[in-house]
């Protein structure tokens, strides 16, 4: 049990065999030590009671019914401080049945086995740390190859070194077995050769981490001065450099956390509490069981057979021992991560078993479903829709959601301002949705940010703070620029709203988590608030020249611009264009001529050829280009300049200039 005041953080890492035993072992009043699961049995087929020393043993994990032992005897559960009570016959503790949710057991393996996460993951941590090929380490772990002269402290008899195939030495081992007793042969074999998890454990235990780091750094420095002759050598050098960097990182992690590398090889495996892998009686009779129970049983069956072969009176054939050790390794692999790096272990219905990795990983796993996916007070959830009128640091919060989330703050405000005499009166006013409630709610949320979160929260931009704005409806309004950080779009995505309660959390939300302070990607440093999807499509539609583009651009210029200058609508300001659109005299895609104020700033027409020049009786002339119409007097001075544009482009230009001016003034 984790106490909120006793522990400030939770660290996940490798556990030593001693630590695993410490989790499970308990000393009974008669001096017996319990905790080790020895039998592969679960429940007795007749009375459906847990088997002794099995996977559901009450002596190890606690009683099934509170205060009742395995014999059926009932006693009062002692209070805290009174001391523990045990049945003198079956030695089951009289306690609550909920202890079966956290009491663990362990299995003592007959041979060391390599942890499949560190052996077969990509990249392999064991192979990387030892500086060996993954193929060689896997062959060693699964007893296809042997390691000669595993320890350099003693003179050897067989004079063999490094890796060799087991079958090439099987005949010699068979002859030696005839001249030695079984115990003597085991001692000789341990000194001369090693294979399986035992060989990997010896290599890891003899590893000097600091020396490994120094050698890898020296090799990296040599590669930095290496001048490759061709691209193939350059790629090979780059791969070697990446491998050395990974090796330095892994060795440094082991040093910093004070974890020993040999703990990646298991000699003891923990057994989950029985209530986390239950067996349930169905109405029609059969038992429904967790896949973990079947996987634990496979490990126990194979491990028990191995112990019997090792402790037998007559020595077992060496090939049989090797085969049984390989079976134990495969069973433990399936228990930890079924199907990693090979075909999965299946049940009678040809369905792959769900291993420990499957139980804790993914959306339905223990972490995301049960630990991180809990319901939280002062939180809500709704569909997100686009809010283009919002600032980047604002979000639209539905009124009905806001009145529930901020209800404690509303009650506090009403009682302080003497608007309600007590809690009950304040709640009744809020439930009646009196007009004053909306006024108070607006005042409350002005100084109170909210947190928006979209699952899965894969990086820190998955949860950001916003200033809420009350809106009608039931959907949360979100600025489209912040969608990239959440990896969200407006096709039905849902987001959760959380209210920070403490002053510290509110301060952190305003200063650190507010969306306008999270404009860069934490991974690459590139801008993450870039227009995309709906924004780009909206800008394209707004600035589109004509919805029916059935002929080329040059043809359109000839047909519309220089022939119809006087027939097309012309305006002298942005305001006149907006006014005409409001009055529905023109639509969004209407082409028009707009008079520009800054005449001298326009120079792009100098690079174009005039399409048409018109003279009038006063001596002035009108020159029409592809995008401009310039009126000049007799001296050649510009009188006016008109730009060819559309209503949508005028709106875009006005909004862009307005936003830019506000930024400059700020």
Swiss-Prot record:
InterPro entries: DNA-dir_RpoC_beta_prime, RNA_pol_asu, RNA_pol_N, RNA_pol_Rpb1_1, RNA_pol_Rpb1_3, RNA_pol_Rpb1_3_sf, RNA_pol_Rpb1_clamp_domain, RNApol_RpoC1
Membrane-crossing segments per the record: none
Location(s) in or outside the cell: Plastid, Chloroplast
Top-rank taxon, per record: Eukaryota
Pfam families xrefs: RNA_pol_Rpb1_1 (PF04997), RNA_pol_Rpb1_2 (PF00623), RNA_pol_Rpb1_3 (PF04983)
Enzyme class: transferase
Binding site for Mg(2+): 489, 491, 493
Cofactor requirement: Mg(2+); Zn(2+)
Cysteines engaged in disulfide bonds, as pairs: none
Its EC number(s): 2.7.7.6
Key words of the record: Chloroplast, DNA-directed RNA polymerase, Magnesium, Metal-binding, Nucleotidyltransferase, Plastid, Transcription, Transferase, Zinc
Assembly and interaction partners: In plastids the minimal PEP RNA polymerase catalytic core is composed of four subunits: alpha, beta, beta', and beta''. When a (nuclear-encoded) sigma factor is associated with the core the holoenzyme is formed, which can initiate transcription.
Known function: DNA-dependent RNA polymerase catalyzes the transcription of DNA into RNA using the four ribonucleoside triphosphates as substrates.
Family, per entry: Belongs to the RNA polymerase beta' chain family. RpoC1 subfamily.
HAMAP family noted in UniProt: RNApol_bact_RpoC1
Name of this protein: DNA-directed RNA polymerase subunit beta'
Organism: Chara vulgaris
